[in-house]
Amino acid sequence: MSYPSFHSYIRTLRSLLKRKQRWLLEESTFLADLCLAYGSIAGLSDRQKHTLFLAAHFKNLGALYLDDHCLHQGFDDHKQALKEMQGLFTESAQIAREAGLQEVAVVLEQYYLRAIPADYLARVFQVINAWVSCRQRKGWRSSMGDKEALVILRQRAEMGWSDPDIVFHFIEHLCRYSSRPELIEACSISGFETAPPASGSGMERLDPWQSGPWSLSAALESDSY
């Protein structure tokens, strides 16, 4: 019997997420793609990008052990949210650790806290995840706008919840290389510079809405991983 390919392995993880809640799949797929795109911009090694890519999928696997009501409602109080969702964070990291993915587990144990993680990859993942979490719909709300998401990222940096260097480097490239009018306007209003993307730069991958709404089916068919 032949061993499954990495492509098949990822599709299995995505199938599990989809069967639980479709938005979990959408979020992990978008997050994984963005981790690869920003990882290249930030000069991460292939191993580091691979770790972030896997973390994007494993971060939601813990949801398989949550009651559905936890995935369908928001929480006004952050402490209550952490308490209700702790099972997701704990189980996701444990699944990764038991799979032998120690570096992935470290990222998943640190990224969700309102503090700058000690691990560098966790710091990178935390920032990308914060953007994705804002821009993707949840089980209990629609996606936030670009301006709202930029404000939240800036606030995280100012309050010491996320690494300021990574936050502003991410925003800089997000704003500079997007050609989507809505994001350009949000960046300008928020005081970030914008510029047309260099031909063939690949930087436009940071904004999956560049050519209209993000296509889940296209992302699922991508062999970029």
Describe each PLM feature range.
Residues 63, 132-133:
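Active-site micro-motifs of SAM-dependent methyltransferase domains
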Residues 69-71, 136-140:
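Juxtamembrane interface at the ends
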Residues 14-21, 39, 112, 135-138, ...:
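Short amphipathic alpha-helical interaction patches enriched in hydrophobic/aromatic residues
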Residues 1-87, 224-225:
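Acidic/His-rich, divalent-metal-binding segments that scaffold phosphate/diphosphate chemistry
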